[in-house]
Amino acid sequence: MKIYRSDRFKKTYKRLPDKVKNSFQKQLRLFVENQKHPSLRAHEIVNTPYREFRVDLQYRVVFRPYEDGVMLLDIGPHDVIDTWSRRGG
């Protein structure tokens, strides 16, 4: 699976605390191995082509699946999902 990172994701990721970056790397490894791993709690964002997975209790990753992989779109506190759900499809 190919992992693409949007410019927005890259910019936001750089500003994260090291602890969150470490948690993200761990969760990304799980995601690549098994997108349905229970600790990811991955699911669709209602009425959008986007999905999310859990980094930790507070942080989430928004992504969009493609045939050859996924595009990581954003990472941030849980309310980042609200921004993407308002965007719709």
Tell me what each language-model feature is.
Residues 3, 22, 36-39, 75:
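Non-catalytic, surface-exposed connector residues within folded enzymatic/regulatory domains
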